[in-house]
């Protein structure tokens, strides 16, 4: 089961998609508890420095815990919004992109090296993002899928 914690832009979007995101977690990992935590730019920068040795804010950090809560996905809506503008994307689609990315990291996928695992990760990410994005747009328009484009 996915829990959406913290505060920030996108929380309601993620809550509305929690069932669909939970389906992806179950498919990729199993029936586990996962937290998606929205944090500020300062918080994620500090976490990135502490855990990765990188002194800049990032959009998503994933931490497997393998306990009652299987893992936590930290998302910084401010960086997501900046990335959306940079990549000519909507905030909503970029948010879906990073949460799916985090789920796949929890499932054991990695992209640090250009290998089969990275290729498979990004292929799955693309499929899941389109699936979730289309479902979200459809929910906005009463089932026609025409809103939010």
Curated annotation (Swiss-Prot):
Its main location: cytoplasm. Disulfide bonds: none annotated. Zn(2+) binds at residues 101, 105, 111. Keywords: Cytoplasm, Endonuclease, Hydrolase, Metal-binding, Nuclease, Ribosome biogenesis, rRNA processing, Zinc. GO terms for biological process: rRNA processing. Its cofactor is Zn(2+). Its EC number is 3.1.-.-. The keyword DNA-binding does not apply. One of its GO terms (molecular function) is metalloendopeptidase activity. GO terms for cellular component: cytoplasm. It is found in: Cytoplasm. It comes from the Bacteria. Single strand-specific metallo-endoribonuclease involved in late-stage 70S ribosome quality control and in maturation of the 3' terminus of the 16S rRNA. PANTHER family: ENDORIBONUCLEASE YBEY, CHLOROPLASTIC. Belongs to the endoribonuclease YbeY family. NCBIfam families: rRNA maturation RNase YbeY (TIGR00043). This is Endoribonuclease YbeY. It comes from Thermotoga neapolitana (strain ATCC 49049 / DSM 4359 / NBRC 107923 / NS-E).
């Amino acid at each position: 089961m996915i829990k959406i914690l913290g505060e920030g832009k996108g929380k309601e979007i993620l809550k509305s998609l929690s069932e669909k995101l939970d389906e992806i977690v179950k498919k990729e990992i199993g029936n586990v508890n996962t937290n998606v935590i929205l944090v500020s730019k300062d918080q994620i920068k500090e976490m990135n420095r502490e855990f990765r040795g990188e002194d800049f804010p990032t959009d998503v950090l994933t931490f497997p815990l393998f306990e009652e809560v299987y893992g936590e996905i930290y998302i910084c809506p401010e960086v997501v919004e900046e990335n959306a503008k940079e990549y000519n994307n909507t905030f909503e689609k970029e948010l879906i992109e990073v949460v799916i990315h985090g789920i796949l990291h929890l499932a054991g996928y990695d992209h640090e090296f250009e290998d089969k695992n990275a290729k498979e990760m990004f292929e799955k990410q693309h499929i899941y993002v389109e699936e979730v994005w289309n479902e979200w747009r459809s929910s906005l328009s009463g089932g026609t899928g025409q809103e939010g484009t």
